[in-house]
Amino acid sequence: MNPRPSIAFAKFAAPQTAANRKGTVFVLSADDGGLSDAARAYDPGKTLERAFPVAEFTGKFAGVVEILAPEGTSLDRLVAIGAGKAAGLDEYAWLKLGGTIAASLRKATDVAVVLDLVGASIDGKDAANLAAGILLRSYSFDKYKTSKDKDDAKADPKKPVKITIHTADPAGAKKAFADAEAVIDGVLLARDLVNEPANILGPVEFAARAKELETLGVKVEILTEKEMKKLGMGSLLGVAQGSPRGARMAVMQWNGGKPKDGPIAFVGKGVTFDTGGNSMKPASGMEDMKGDMGGAAAVTGLMHALAARKAKANVVGIIGLVENAVDGHAQRPGDIVTSMSGQTIEVLNTDAEGRLVLADALWYCNDRFQPKFMVNLATLTGAIMVALGLHYAGLFSNNDELAERLAAAGQATQERLWRMPLGAEYDKLIDSKNADMKNIGGRYGGAIIAAQFLQRFVKDTPWAHLDIAGTAMGSPSSEINQSWGSGFGVRLLDRLVRDHYES
């Protein structure tokens, strides 16, 4: 992997210092096409501004124009980034501007960003969000490549990019960035986990990665198959029985709130590879099922983020980790298993396994911790992708307040959610003549039926299910993400905790 950029903050340079600057400089221009005085200091010959009309650069958001070796300077490149409407830049806009800068770095190793804009008041949080956008877009997963592609335009991996962001409030920016960087680290951890191949990251290895959070102050317990069997987790263990790689459950606790406060809880599906079991998936595209642990990755990344920024909340993160493989011991269609709740399940499709894992994980979480609410994340159904495409995750909930708060957090972070229905009409579709329930329903409403199944394991606890099958992996590239594994859910849930549940 290319090393992440090194980011520092400083005051605006004096004109003489700016004129003698070397390397690459980025400046911002609003939609009137004008530069601030701080930006003009790097272009005494006005070479860049003269290029605006020729390049048809108007300051439109994320537009880019650059000059190589501008006259009268020692710079290699001078680059203008369009900021659009100066007065309308929100948190996500600053992230995207940072991503645009990262995409334009090329092989630069010494970079200055002049964070000044005519018509806008830019504070420390804005600067921190721009820096966070740079880190998000700069991420790449190429650790297994032994040589660079010939057309790779990125900098030499042995020379990490040094970026200095010049702003009116460098102290405020530095403080805000420490908080933002903690969250970004959680996102990048989630991306790493989703991107890892399944031969490297199985249930045991994933559990070990979760255990590493102890260095941040997270309490981590790893339940083995023997311990889960003793607890009666027949639903989860049934999925795992076809693989020689043992199942695990990681229980993570961050106690940053008041001792008397009950915890909030997040539960993730962690199927480290999903063949479909005896209900085998088609070979085409099966390689993507290394990412079927995107929910567990998001929960692990969230716990990293909360601990790293010392969130003032008591939070539990639980991930059920299995591999759904096929051998002579694998679960068969028609098998009946007993979940930790005591409810029996007729397994009619072994490729509807994520809900079986979550059933025991949710029950265990609720039974042990009595949380204020539970939110589970899972790459659960292809049906949600048919319904919503790749830009929204499905939101199902038994609690309107929790659903509204999640939707608002999704809008604020642009990790967007769309609420889907639940109801008795759907619930009866999973009734079984041979057991308390079956793990699939009819042909229609597959994402809803999966959510109805999960609801049978949460009692009356406020609960939400996020089906992130379309957003956790293989989602469209954006200004802040070019990775196959997106890390979806970390920023969303951090925002939920930050806005509503910190003491």
UniProtKB/Swiss-Prot annotation:
GO terms for molecular function: manganese ion binding; metalloaminopeptidase activity. It is found in: Cytoplasm. Mn(2+) 1 binds at residues 274, 351, 353. The keyword Protease applies. It catalyses: Release of an N-terminal amino acid, Xaa-|-Yaa-, in which Xaa is preferably Leu, but may be other amino acids including Pro although not Arg or Lys, and Yaa may be Pro. Amino acid amides and methyl esters are also readily hydrolyzed, but rates on arylamides are exceedingly low; Release of an N-terminal amino acid, preferentially leucine, but not glutamic or aspartic acids. Belongs to the peptidase M17 family. This is Probable cytosol aminopeptidase.
